[in-house]
Amino acid sequence: MNKELMASLVCNTVRCMKNRSTVPDKREPLAIPQAVLFDAYGTLFDVYSVALAAEQLFPGHGQALSLLWRDKQIEYTRLVTTSNHGAHYRPFWELTRAALVFAIKKIALTSITTGPEASFDQNFGAAVERLMNQYRSLSAFPENREVLSELQRLGIPTGILSNGDPAMLQLAVKSAGMDGLLTHVISVDPIRKYKTHPDAYALGEQATGLPAGRIAFVSSNAWDALAATWYGYQTLWVNRSQQPFEELGTLPTRTGSSLRAVLDFFPSPPLNEV
């Protein structure tokens, strides 16, 4: 290799390195969150804990029923939010019941023999009431109180930001023994728009008085974590069952296998910027 070519290569390499060093890094360090908001259903409260009761009522179909119930519940929230400017909005409790009735009807039509003259209520009314009562007081995940207590010790305001209507959330929090551990319990019901509508996520900013970028939002629902990330929150996806994340080109800020991963947002020893 001649000297002129060598000099040219060296010059180009230096120039390239110099230019690279002047390009700003878009991945700026994230500020320590000043508040933490949690999704409720699926994140703090185990929506599939109803599967045991469902299995007792519908032997051999409890797991399938609980999965279909949850999927249809979420589908209904999206349907009433996006259709006809929300004119068909119904409270979350009503949508939860409607989704359960659908799930039972689908399983009954394909798998369960019933009397041809009997109405749905005669055949399944008691089962609907039992499962809805179970949903009022869903099992909480075991690490909830530990994590919320630690955040409280750090002086970090916490809250729920949920599709659930106020009465549902109040009872769920009380049943889980989390009274006094949450600064805010925020329902989308007053705005009549369910997540993932941006107005639903804006409620977190309004309640805390903080911009989304200074709030950590925690959800076990990948679609919820994705939409919250798009909105501007720092996010934690709690991936308890080792599922893939949504394939839409955006990842959550953090991923963990339990609620304890939210504590990774805060240095140790804790440094509270509030």
Model region roles, listed by residue range:
Residues L57, Q63, Y76-R130:
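A metal-dependent, Asp-based hydrolase signature
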Residues D25-I74:
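Active-site neighborhood of HAD-like aspartate-dependent phosphohydrolases
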Residues V50, L65, A127, M178-L181:
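Hydrophobic side chains within well-formed alpha-helices
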Residues A51, S66, R70, W93, ...:
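An amphipathic alpha-helix signature
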Residues W93-E94, T114-G115, N123-G159, Q170, ...:
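Short, acidic loop-to-helix structural element flanking the phosphoryl-transfer center
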Residues M6-T13, M17-P33, S149-R153, L161-V274:
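Asp-based, Mg2+/Mn2+-dependent phosphohydrolase catalytic module
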